[in-house]
Amino acid sequence: MEINPYLMFLNNDVTSLISTTYPYTGPPPMSHGSSTKYTLETIKRTYDYSRTSVEKTSKVFNIPRRKFCNCLEDKDELVKPTGNVDISSLLGLAEMMEKRMGEGFFKHCVMEAETEILKMHFSRLTEGRQTYDWTSERNMPAATALQLTVDAIKETEGPFKGTTMLEYCNKMIEMLDWKEVKFRKVKTMVRREKDKRSGKEIKTKVPVMGIDSIKHDEFLIRALTINTMAKDGERGKLQRRAIATPGMIVRPFSKIVETVAQKICEKLKESGLPVGGNEKKAKLKTTVTSLNARMNSDQFAVNITGDNSKWNECQQPEAYLALLAYITKDSSDLMKDLCSVAPVLFCNKFVKLGQGIRLSNKRKTKEVIIKAEKMGKYKNLMREEYKNLFEPLEKYIQKDVCFLPGGMLMGMFNMLSTVLGVSTLCYMDEELKAKGCFWTGLQSSDDFVLFAVASNWSNIHWTIRRFNAVCKLIGINMSLEKSYGSLPELFEFTSMFFDGEFVSNLAMELPAFTTAGVNEGVDFTAAMSIIKTNMINNSLSPSTALMALRICLQEFRATYRVHPWDSRVKGGRMKIINEFIKTIENKDGLLIADGGKLMNNISTLHIPEEVLKFEKMDEQYRNRVFNPKNPFTNFDKTIDIFRAHGPIRVEENEAVVSTHSFRTRANRTLLNTDMRAMMAEEKRYQMVCDMFKSVFESADINPPIGAMSIGEAIEEKLLERAKMKRDIGAIEDSEYEEIKDIIRDAKKARIESR
């Protein structure tokens, strides 16, 4: 009999089947090597989508500066993306949005943000992850980058005494006017010494903390530089993308703009940010149900699951400046000034090009890297692909940075771009009213859903085209190939599938159902708590939850090699366990980790198995399992849970403390042999590790630190303790000599037994 795969569609709805197509079972692919190519592609796309050649020479940097707003020249094939924003249309949309939300809506939001900003401490900037550090010109953790910037102020002008975000912002604006900036930098000095034995000269590198200084022009470029790197962990894509991290001089201003935008997003019912999880689902459900109330009896809706092409390349900082000017028009002068700084800095940004371009000869036997600074000099060596990327941008490149007045890089101003997107969803004009059409939707950064409402199909077509035209005016390009329309209440939004209600995407949670590998006590309880959480969220039906529980049990038994006492499974561990089980009368009270059977079902998922089996245990067995003085008994408050996407989730540990709650420790003692031989061995290991790390930059390798048997480690420790006791006078010399003799005899016996 042949199996027909289409039978799956009979029992399952389409939206739940979509979730099975995600390849979430393995780890996502990592990106290796130089990010220069991806960065050049992003910059070239931004210049191409401007569809204009209007340029002026920048007075500050003496580089040609392209205009990205109000100057659309190339009007051919407008289906393709365009990044030229019409400012008057943008302000008109913002006005419509304020009218719909009520008079003084923006003013109220900015006042809320202002009270928060005035209290904000500048240490909030340490929350970020990797940040570009302008002193060393590479990425650092956010806290380190902030400390180095504060140190630079100290070296140039004296200690920085401010505490609030505003004082820090003022200092940054002052810094941009300084004629010279001094900062700390680690330099390596080469020291030469002669070896007494061999007479050879030995070179050693010594790190020395020095003070460096740069002039105003150089500092301006460094302050406005945004570093780029290739994005890690992207599924289903052959080409990588570049993501960006700004420096500590731009960060505080963008933080302020995002705070203002967040207050606006919280009050917009079409916005998918800043809430998440179940709260987000409830907000979206309200928007969908309110649509039905607005529709007349002769109207019908079509849902469009939209996809915006090249969102970041078509966003313009100049447009953001105009939008923020409108938002803060009735606010205090302080907020007007503060909100205008970030877009102005982004209008003059420099993008760091990365490590450079790798070239090889025809036979692929030799490889060479052309650094970013020398690309202009050696462009005759480049392939056609790289030449076409580099030559149009050559006039904008200075050393290893490129001037980019337009466009946003990934991860900047997520909230503000959502406000921009929602403003298109609030649009209404006389022509739409006359035809009895309107639209609404949901927006979350570059992801959107459109609900188009009309009375017949031709009007629906016209409404969607109208929406597309409104979006084009402010640089939002709806991709006609990737967007698709469907019947009402059937769409996908930010990986959430909606079909009358939200359908679970179980594939995301699959890795969390497996054995965590902490210890026998915690693992099964953790898996049960995940199944329970997913049942509460409507992600698992009762039958699927039961199946998941059985799979967890099988994997738990396979991991710890413990099988039911009557299963007759043979194995080294089962031999020992079976001998111990013979002494127990009531075998129903045995824990799973001791060869017992599963007692939990779906209704008792929240109760740990130790509690369920407590009454059935033999008294002697119970006293052994719950013995607080047992050295294996240990309790951790939290437990780490791995998921297919996103960071590791930390949850509360609900497991009962028993003798199975042990914690394994690593033996980190050093090799007690001739030091020289060990050093040589370590050097070889270190070399291999370094080679591997240089190829796979995101690999996490712990370099080996030698090996030592436990016997040697104990002997070494005993001698050390005895010597210390003798030195403080706790034991006499004769006792110390006796201890040494005993250890020597033990060492001999150990070596002979080998």
From Swiss-Prot:
GO terms for molecular function: nucleotide binding; RNA binding; RNA-directed RNA polymerase activity. It holds the Pfam family Flu_PB1. Disulfide bonds: none annotated. Its EC number is 2.7.7.48. It comes from the Viruses. It catalyses: RNA(n) + a ribonucleoside 5'-triphosphate = RNA(n+1) + diphosphate. A motif (Nuclear localization signal) lies at residues 189-197, 205-218. One of its GO terms (cellular component) is host cell cytoplasm. Phosphorylated by host PRKCA. Its main location: host cell. InterPro entries: RNA-dir_pol_NSvirus (IPR007099), RNA_pol_PB1_influenza (IPR001407). GO terms for biological process: DNA-templated transcription; symbiont-mediated suppression of host gene expression; symbiont-mediated suppression of host mRNA transcription via inhibition of RNA polymerase II activity; viral RNA genome replication; viral transcription. Residues 288-484 form the RdRp catalytic domain. Residues 251-258 are annotated as: Promoter-binding site. PROSITE patterns: RDRP_SSRNA_NEG_SEG (PS50525). Keywords: Eukaryotic host gene expression shutoff by virus, Eukaryotic host transcription shutoff by virus, Host cytoplasm, Host gene expression shutoff by virus, Host nucleus, Host-virus interaction, Inhibition of host RNA polymerase II by virus, Nucleotide-binding, Nucleotidyltransferase, Phosphoprotein, RNA-directed RNA polymerase, Transferase, Viral RNA replication, Viral transcription. The keyword DNA-binding does not apply. It is found in: Host nucleus; Host cytoplasm. RNA-dependent RNA polymerase which is responsible for replication and transcription of virus RNA segments. The transcription of viral mRNAs occurs by a unique mechanism called cap-snatching. 5' methylated caps of cellular mRNAs are cleaved after 10-13 nucleotides by PA. In turn, these short capped RNAs are used as primers by PB1 for transcription of viral mRNAs. During virus replication, PB1 initiates RNA synthesis and copy vRNA into complementary RNA (cRNA) which in turn serves as a template for the production of more vRNAs. Belongs to the influenza viruses polymerase PB1 family. Influenza RNA polymerase is composed of three subunits: PB1, PB2 and PA. Interacts (via N-terminus) with PA (via C-terminus). Interacts (via C-terminus) with PB2 (via N-terminus); this interaction is essential for transcription initiation. This is RNA-directed RNA polymerase catalytic subunit. The lineage of its organism: Viruses, Riboviria, Orthornavirae, Negarnaviricota, Polyploviricotina. The gene is PB1.
